[in-house]
Amino acid sequence: MLAVFLQGFALSAAMILPLGPQNVFVMNQGIRRQYHLMVASLCALSDIVLICGGIFGGSALLSRSPLLLALVTWGGVAFLLWYGWGAFRTAFSRQLALATAEELKQSRWRLVVTMLAVTWLNPHVYLDTFVVLGSLGGQLTPDVRSWFALGAVSASVVWFFALALLASWLAPWLKTQMAQRIINTLVGVVMWGIALQLAWQGASL
C-alpha cells in the first residue's frame, strides 16, 4: 500500500512542480497575500476532483471525445492570452500600485472565477490527471487504486499550500515595484508561451 501511495505522490508531484498557470497564479496571490490560502484550497480541491475523476473512470471520456478536448484547448488558449496580456499591461504600466484592502475585498469573487478558469480551462490539467494519472491508476486493482489516488492528491495539497505560504513569506522582498514588474513579465511570458504551445497542439486535433 505504501509503495502505491508513494508512486501516486511522486508521479503527481512530477507533473505539478513545473511552472504553469496554476502555480503562477498561486504564487502571485501569495506574494500579494491576497486570499492566497483560499486560492491554494480551491486549486487543491479542483485537483482532487480531477485526479479522482481521471483515476476512477474519467480518462475514457476524454479519449472518446476529440470535440471536448478541442473545445477545452481553444478555450484555454483564449483565456491564457487574455491573462498574459493583463500581466504584461501591469508590468509595463507607468504607475504600479499595490491593491488596497477595499480593492482586495471587492475582488474576492473575481479571484475565484479567475482561479477556476486557470485550472479548468487548462488542457494540460486534463492530460495530466485524466490521461497520465487516469491511465496508470486505472490499470491498478481496485483494492490499491484508492491508495494511488490518495498519494496523487496528497502531493497536490502539499504543493499548493507550500507554494502559497512560501510566496507569502517572501512577500516583503517580492513586493517592490521592480520585483512586481519582473514577476508580471515572467507571468506574461509563461502564459503566452503555454497558449502558443496549446494552439500548436490544437491545430493538429
Swiss-Prot record:
InterPro entries: Arg_export_ArgO_enterobac, LeuE-type, Lys/arg_exporter. Keywords: Amino-acid transport, Cell inner membrane, Cell membrane, Membrane, Transmembrane, Transmembrane helix, Transport. GO terms for cellular component: plasma membrane. The chain crosses the membrane at residues 1-21, 37-57, 68-88, 112-132, 147-167, 182-202. Pfam families: LysE (PF01810). It is found in: Cell inner membrane. It is a multi-pass membrane protein. It catalyses: L-arginine(in) = L-arginine(out). GO terms for molecular function: L-arginine transmembrane transporter activity. Belongs to the LysE/ArgO transporter (TC 2.A.75) family. Involved in the export of arginine. Important to control the intracellular level of arginine and the correct balance between arginine and lysine. This is Arginine exporter protein ArgO. It comes from Serratia proteamaculans (strain 568). The gene is argO.
